[in-house]
Regions:
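Conserved N-terminal beta1-alpha1 strand-loop-helix module at the mouth
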Residues: 1-64, 140-161
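Short beta-strand/loop segments at the ligand-binding rim of alpha/beta enzyme cores
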Residues: 8-16, 56-71, 179-198
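Active-site mouth loops of central-metabolism enzymes
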Residues: 11-26, 70-74, 125-147, 198-202
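Glycine-rich phosphate-binding active-site loops on the catalytic face of alpha/beta enzymes
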Residues: 41-47, 83-98, 157, 164-166, ...
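C-terminal helical cap(s) of enzyme catalytic domains, especially alpha/beta-barrels
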Residues: 54-57, 101, 109, 221-253
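Catalytic cores of alpha/beta
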Residues: 69, 73-87, 179-182, 193-217
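Conserved anion-binding
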Residues: 76-160, 246
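Glycine/Thr-rich beta-alpha phosphate-binding loop at enzyme active sites
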Residues: 129-180, 219, 224-226, 231
Length: 253
């Protein structure tokens, strides 16, 4: 069975992302994990340490859903996750974020990688003001460039996930529409990629709109606001309504 099959990736519509560098009370973490989300993703950009990642993973040890780690640094290469999502920054201006860091890591720990749990994820880091964009030297793509990036990740590389990330705020609606349209065409031709979106999802309306355009929404920064648990409930309600009413996300036709 593939890594995607092991974690039921095809059924994910709502994912929460928790940052090891932004601690939450243990009870809050427990409530998030048991909320009904489809998966929990551990990941971040800044000040990651092995101890922080392990601490958060330990708090999620009883989660009833898959707990996955976004491997953005060697500190994230710890045992115990259900899957490891390896980011390929498709629009990076520095090739170390597309292949360089990956080769360095594989040279160090490649013999111990649990390949049955590894998925490559094509990231399109579209908000130039985000920490991830600054680190990866990623510029905001035009609509034409975005279409090419989706076609490259989904059509050429056949990645299981293409992730449109607009961390910190909402992406322009037209940008998400372009990504969804390109991915639908590739999937209709036999492609397998799923489209994730993360950025600015802070309540029912923003979640519901994105669920009409993409396969999976990722709720992250808003969980750390004073309304964090309320945001979680609202976005899950949007997911449930989308499932009940048949919102297509990225259908095959």
């Amino acid at each position: 069975m593939t890594a995607a099959g092991r974690i039921g990736l095809a059924g994910w519509r709502h994912v929460v992302k928790l940052d090891p560098d932004k601690p939450l009370p243990a009870e809050t973490v427990r409530r998030i994990a048991a909320s009904g989300t489809d998966a929990v993703l551990i990941g971040g950009t800044q000040r990651l340490t092995r101890a922080k990642v392990l601490r958060l993973l330990w708090r999620l040890r009883h989660a009833p859903v898959p707990v996955c780690i976004e491997v953005t640094a060697m500190a994230c290469a710890v045992p115990g996750a259900d899957a490891y999502l390896v980011p390929l920054a498709l629009n990076t201006g520095d090739l170390q974020w597309l292949s360089g860091r990956h080769l360095e890591g594989l040279a160090r720990v490649g013999a111990r990688v649990p390949w049955e749990r590894v998925l490559a994820v094509g990231y399109i880091i579209a908000n130039p003001h985000s920490a991830a964009a600054r680190r990866a030297q990623a510029a905001e793509p035009s609509e034409e460039e975005l279409a090419a990036l989706v076609r490259y990740g989904a059509g050429i590389l056949d990645l299981p996930v293409v992730y449109l990330e607009y961390s910190g705020s909402q992406a322009p609606d037209a940008m998400v529409e372009v990504a969804g349209r390109c991915l639908r065409r590739i999937r209709a031709a036999g492609g397998r990629s799923r489209l994730f979106y993360g950025g600015g999802i802070a309540g029912y309306e923003s979640a519901r709109r994105r669920l009409q355009q993409v396969d999976t929404i990722v709720v992250g920064n808003a969980l750390y606001s004073p309304r964090g648990l309320a945001v979680l409930e609202e976005t899950l309600a949007a997911r449930d309504d989308a499932l009940r009413e048949g919102d297509p996300g990225c259908p095959t036709s």
